[in-house]
């Protein structure tokens, strides 16, 4: 999934992080060099609290002029991410591969037996669903399908 493609659809990319603003001042330029940029990145620095509280999502909504939580999707790789999204009452999607919850490097994933990897992914999926995730995907490549599904639900009031 290319972020540029989402932007062409009018989707704004907001980010929340547990890192401090000083840390993000180092991380964001490096991420941009690798092709990842956000329209807004919110840290807990100037807010009452970070995750799992919803304040960083709400600050993104304010700064990006998004009027409704129905129009927000929280995508994350930790249980704290999932709880942040649920507490903000936004669509919440967990990701498994590359996640802190799975705790494996790409090389470890590639070297793991398919049966073991399937079992580990099922454990993470279950934890994310129990934390309240609306959807859980293996990778970001599945996100366009989830966005399409959510848009369909919003357009049909389901």
Residues covered by each model-derived region:
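Asp-based, Mg2+/Mn2+-dependent phosphohydrolase catalytic module
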Residues: 20-21, 25-158
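Conserved ATPase "switch" residues in P-loop NTPase domains
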Residues: 7
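Short, small-residue-biased leader/transition segments that mark boundaries at the very start
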Residues: 1-2
């Amino acid at each position: 999934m290319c972020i540029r493609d989402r932007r062409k659809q009018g989707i704004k990319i907001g980010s929340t992080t547990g890192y401090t603003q000083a840390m993000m001042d180092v991380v964001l330029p490096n991420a941009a060099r690798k092709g990842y940029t956000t329209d807004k990145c919110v840290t807990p620095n100037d807010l009452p609290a970070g995750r799992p509280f919803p304040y960083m999502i709400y600050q993104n909504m304010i700064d990006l002029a998004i009027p409704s939580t129905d129009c927000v999707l929280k995508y994350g790789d930790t249980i704290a991410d999932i709880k942040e999204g649920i507490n903000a009452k936004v669509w919440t999607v967990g990701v498994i591969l590359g996640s802190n919850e799975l705790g494996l490097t790409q090389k470890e994933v590639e070297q793991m037996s398919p049966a073991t990897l399937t079992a580990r992914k099922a454990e993470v999926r279950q934890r994310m669903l129990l934390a309240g995730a609306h959807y859980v995907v293996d990778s970001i490549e599945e996100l366009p399908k989830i966005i399409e599904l959510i848009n369909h639900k919003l357009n049909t009031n389901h």
